Structures are given as structure tokens and as C-alpha cells.
């Protein structure tokens, strides 16, 4: 049965046509039983019903190609929050080990403004970079830490600059705006040591959303802006679901996809806040005056549409914003240190930060 997709904005701004209209076929499906031809129709409400055969692009690395062919178990009962957090902790340990081989560092646990932080100092830190700092807001669906190692270690290594990873309070125990408040508190404290034009704030997934939210909050509070923002795979709003969320899971085409119901996204994080609140959903904010921003996403990212939509909103607000899209790869693929594309993505992120900090 074809997958129901929400309509048509996906055709407007994205160059990767093969990825845009695709049925999610479970990984257990063999080539002999998978769909072999393209079919589609659009009903009177603009809902698309599609089946697509999507070959992997020829320039994908062998490592990335292998990573796409992963067995996904049948959909079982939802995992408990405790189990999810334990799994994320194990994943973080693997990220730490893999990336630390490529980017030697020292890691220290601390607190800043009463907020737990993890400070990653690259072995390549030079005297000229001691007056600069990068502030990371990790991914993890706002309820776990899925990436503070995979986001901070390579960026510290490739920039040669210390990273402060903020271990902000998590939902559902602490819904919005707790994470924003924690990040702003750490930023305020960093301003006592570092000039704002020597700070970059960045994050992936939930941390990318949080980066955009913090930028709006800093403007609202009249605090000085950092030198730059890095928004790597983000939602643009919480009151609606974008097209790519109706196509992909967090593993791209792999796994079971529940059709979006059109309601509030992530109610445990949103809590009692109006989902159109401009800090919570930055697409509704006045974005004028924000610093240069790099957006990064990928062709099979569930948050591809949200990232592209927010990038366009930044451009409409005359922000110096640029967007990089990696073909065919799933959500936050750059956590995987074994992929050449992950190293490339991390270098792109790091080079952008270095250019902005050099101004």
C-alpha cells in the first residue's frame, strides 16, 4: 500500500528530485519483492500517494552505502524513556571513542551558571584560539543526549577551539523553556570571559532547534549576538509537520513510519506553551539582525523540509545564511565517524566557524 504524503512544498526548493517522493520500504524487503516502477497520484486535497524506486547515488562512499543497508526491526512497543536514555549513553560512548581517535582531546565535566556542561579541549588548541569558544547544544529529541560527543569532539578537533557542550534540562521533566533558559544562562556566563564575536553557538537536531530558539531569545533580551550560528538539521515550527517528516524516519527510508497526524509536534517539549510562540517556533519570529548562519541537512533527513524552510526564513530576514545538503544520507549522519561524508560535513561546519571567528 502506498504511503500517504502531505503535498507539494517539497517540490519547491529542493534539488534532489529522487529523494522527494518515496515510499518507505522496510529493510527486510528483498529486491525481488520491492516496487520496481514509479507510480503516483495526488487527490483533490493535494495529498500525494506515491511509490518510488530510489537508487543510491553513484558518488556515495562505500562506507555510507553500507550504512544505508541496515536491518531495522519490526515496529515493537515504544521504548521507555529510561531505556532510550541508556541507549543514548552507550551511543555517546561509541561516538567518544571513534571521534577521539581522529581528533585527540581532553574532556572535563563541569558546571557553568549552575548548568552541567562537558568541556572538550582539542589537543591542537593554540594560544591564538584561547580567547575563542564554541557552545554546543546537543541533539536527542529534547529528552536525551544523543550527540554531545559526536557534535563536540570533531568540531573541537577541526577548529582547534574549545567546545562547551551544554547538558541542558530535558523533557518531559522540564518542558520548554527550560532548555532555552539553561543555554542562555551559560551564554551569559561565557560573555564574562569571551567577547561575543569570539563565540559560536551550534547544534544538531533538537540542539539545532534550540540554537535557533536561543538566538531569538538573545535578541528578545537585548544580549549581544555571537559571531555565528550552526543549525544542523532542524524543525522550523512545532504547530505543524513538514513534508519530509511524512516521507522519512530518522533512519531515512528504513524503519516503520507513522503517518503524521498534523497535530503539535513533540507535545512533551512544547508543554503548555503556544506552539506558535516565536521563541519556541522560530519561523514565526522576527529574524532580522541574527548573525551569519550555516544550515546543514541531508537528502533523506526527516528534518530536511524544516531546515530548508528556516533557511529561507533567514534569507527573507536578510541574514547571511547558507545551506548545505548531503545527498541520500539520513538524519544527523555526521555522528558516524566511519563515514567520509561525516568527516567532510564536520570540516564544512568547522571551516564556517573559523571564517566567522576570523572577522
Residue ranges of predicted features:
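Alpha/beta-hydrolase superfamily serine-hydrolase fold, recognizing
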Residues: 24-43, 51-77, 102-359
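A domain-start/cap signature at the N-terminus of enzymes
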Residues: 81-110
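Short alpha-helical segments used as structural interaction elements across diverse proteins
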Residues: 3, 62, 81-82
Amino acid at each position: 500500500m502506498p504511503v500517504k504524503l502531505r503535498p507539494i512544498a517539497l517540490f519547491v526548493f529542493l534539488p534532489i528530485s529522487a529523494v522527494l517522493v518515496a515510499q518507505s520500504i522496510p529493510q527486510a524487503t528483498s529486491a525481488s519483492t520491492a516496487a520496481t516502477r514509479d507510480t503516483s497520484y495526488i487527490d483533490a486535497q493535494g495529498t500525494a500517494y506515491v511509490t518510488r524506486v530510489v537508487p543510491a547515488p553513484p558518488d556515495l562512499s562505500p562506507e555510507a552505502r553500507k550504512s544505508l543497508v541496515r536491518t531495522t526491526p519490526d515496529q515493537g512497543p515504544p521504548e521507555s524513556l529510561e531505556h532510550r536514555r541508556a541507549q543514548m549513553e552507550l551511543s555517546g560512548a561509541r561516538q567518544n571513542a571513534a571521534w577521539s581517535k581522529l581528533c585527540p582531546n581532553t574532556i572535563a565535566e563541569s558546571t557553568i551558571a549552575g548548568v552541567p556542561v562537558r568541556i572538550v579541549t582539542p589537543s591542537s588548541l593554540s594560544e591564538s584560539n584561547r580567547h575563542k569558544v564554541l557552545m554546543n547544544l546537543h541533539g536527542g529529541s529534547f529528552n536525551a543526549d544523543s550527540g554531545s560527543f559526536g557534535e563536540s569532539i570533531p568540531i573541537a578537533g577541526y577548529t582547534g577551539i574549545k567546545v562547551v557542550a551544554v547538558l541542558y534540562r530535558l523533557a518531559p521533566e522540564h518542558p520548554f523553556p527550560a532548555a532555552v533558559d539553561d543555554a542562555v544562562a551559560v551564554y551569559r556566563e561565557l560573555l564574562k570571559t569571551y567577547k561575543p564575536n569570539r563565540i559560536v553557538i551550534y547544534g544538531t537536531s533538537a540542539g539545532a532547534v534550540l540554537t535557533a530558539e536561543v538566538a531569538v531569545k538573545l535578541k528578545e533580551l537585548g544580549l549581544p549576538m555571537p559571531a555565528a550560528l550552526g543549525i544542523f538539521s532542524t524543525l522550523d515550527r512545532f504547530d505543524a509537520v513538514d513534508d519530509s517528516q511524512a516521507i522519512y524516519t530518522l533512519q531515512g527510508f528504513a524503519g516503520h513510519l507513522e503517518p503524521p497526524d498534523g497535530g503539535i509536534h513533540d507535545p512533551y517539549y512544547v508543554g503548555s506553551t503556544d506552539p506558535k510562540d516565536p521563541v519556541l517556533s522560530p519561523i514565526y519570529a522576527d529574524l532580522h539582525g541574527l548573525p551569519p548562519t550555516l544550515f546543514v541537512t541531508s537528502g533523506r533527513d526527516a528534518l530536511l523540509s524544516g531546515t530548508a524552510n528556516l533557511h529561507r526564513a533567514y534569507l527573507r530576514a536578510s541574514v547571511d545564511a547558507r545551506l548545505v545538503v548531503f545527498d541520500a544520507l539520513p538524519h544527523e549522519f555526521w555522528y558516524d565517524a566511519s563515514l567520509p561524508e561525516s568527516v567532510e560535513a564536520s570540516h564544512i561546519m568547522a571551516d564556517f566557524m573559523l571564517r566567522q571567528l576570523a572577522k
